[in-house]
Design a protein with these regions (language model features):
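Internal catalytic-core helix/loop-beta-alpha segment
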Residues: 66-106
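Acidic/polar N-terminal loop/beta-strand segments that form early-domain functional surfaces
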Residues: 10-14, 24-25, 39-41
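Charged catalytic cores and adjacent phosphate/nucleic-acid-binding surfaces used
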Residues: 3-5, 17-26, 30, 44-60, ...
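Short loop/turn segments at strand-loop or loop-helix junctions that form parts
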Residues: 41, 55, 87-90
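Short, well-ordered beta-to-alpha junction loops that form the rim of enzyme active sites
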Residues: 13, 87-90, 153
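Divalent metal-dependent hydrolysis catalytic cores, especially in the metallo-beta-lactamase
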Residues: 1-17, 83-85
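Hydrophobic faces of well-ordered beta-strands that scaffold small-molecule active sites
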Residues: 8-9, 36-40, 84-86, 121, ...
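Metal-cofactor-binding active-site regions of metalloenzymes
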Residues: 32-48, 82
């Protein structure tokens, strides 16, 4: 809030612990007009990290257990009304969509199939280089996917260094899901 943001998406690795901490210990005590949404950064076995946002009230313990193949993750997320997209698709050496697949003789047809099923792409990651982020933006444009920006705050200095501009009427996960499904571009 002090940095001028109206809200945030908490997406820990394979866990909702950060969101639960906010919900159980912080919610309603400070900044009651600050929106906090729940997500997860899921570690797939074959395509690196995926950002997942589910409608409020949907509880899938499966999303806190790492290791599903990306295709199964996409199917489960969509079945329960959520959205999914690759985090830092060209970033981190072994934990990104493109670099993970490069080690496994990734074929353009498989990338196309996955990209058609994703709902968005993280196109700006504050902990990645401009070159890597530009490649992610090109990937999103090529497949006409909305882009998210994220701090990926594994380091204190990354907190609040990136954002995604969203309408003020997004107050819950379902609002965000509906919005992402309705647009082809999101302003960073």
């Amino acid at each position: 809030k002090e940095k001028g943001f109206g809200g945030m998406l908490v997406s820990d690795h394979n866990s909702y612990d950060g969101y639960r901490e906010w919900r159980d210990s912080i919610k309603g005590k400070n900044h009651t007009d600050f929106v906090v949404l729940k997500g997860v950064e899921y570690d797939t076995i074959d395509c690196g990290h995926m950002l997942v946002i589910m409608p409020e009230g949907v509880k899938l313990k499966l999303l806190e257990l790492r290791g599903l193949p990306a295709q199964i993750l996409i199917m489960v997320v969509h079945k329960y009304g959520g959205i999914v997209g690759p985090a830092h698709p060209y970033g981190e050496k072994y934990l990104s969509l493109i670099k993970t697949q490069a080690r496994k003789k990734f074929h353009e047809e498989r990338l196309k199939s996955l990209m058609e099923q994703f709902d968005f792409v993280e196109v700006f990651n504050a902990c990645e280089s401009e070159e890597v982020n530009e490649k992610a933006r090109k990937l999103a444009r090529k497949y006409h996917k909305p882009g998210f920006g994220g701090s990926d705050a594994h380091r204190l200095e990354c907190i609040g260094m990136a954002y995604t501009k969203l309408p003020d009427n997004i107050r819950c996960e379902s609002d965000l899901i509906k919005y992402v499904k309705s647009v082809s571009y999101i302003c960073l």
